[in-house]
Amino acid sequence: MFEVRAALEGLAAAIVSARPDLVALVAKLQIALDALESARGSINHMVEVDLAFHRLLCELTGNITLVRTWEALAGSIRMSIMFAGTDKAITNMSVPRHQQVIDAIATGDPAVARDAVDQHMREAAQNLLSDQSSEDDASEPIIA
């Protein structure tokens, strides 16, 4: 699933980075990221805000097919986050990881933007697939 997300969201980042209204679009992404930072404390709320950030990235392309394709994956994305366990989910939803994506988009270079999303997804997949979990987490799924 992360390969598909990397392709889809990488395309979205590349499109957004080449838009003439880039500054305004980056500001919208930053607001969405600020919401993620404010969501700390409620893991379920964090998941929804994280998904909203990624959906927004797709929406900012103005490409309805891209958005609908992302929406078709949203349930599977949510499930993978919820079953990863709290510690892994929080790591993947970290503000610095998302800020790197925004910063890459803000360069206006589609290749840089796409690469940042690829890295974000690669790290998220590695984290979810790792056997390392804290004693507190014990890989317990997040119950909504």
Q: What spans do the regions from the language model cover?
A:
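C-terminal effector-binding regulatory domain of bacterial HTH transcription factors
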Residues: 110-144
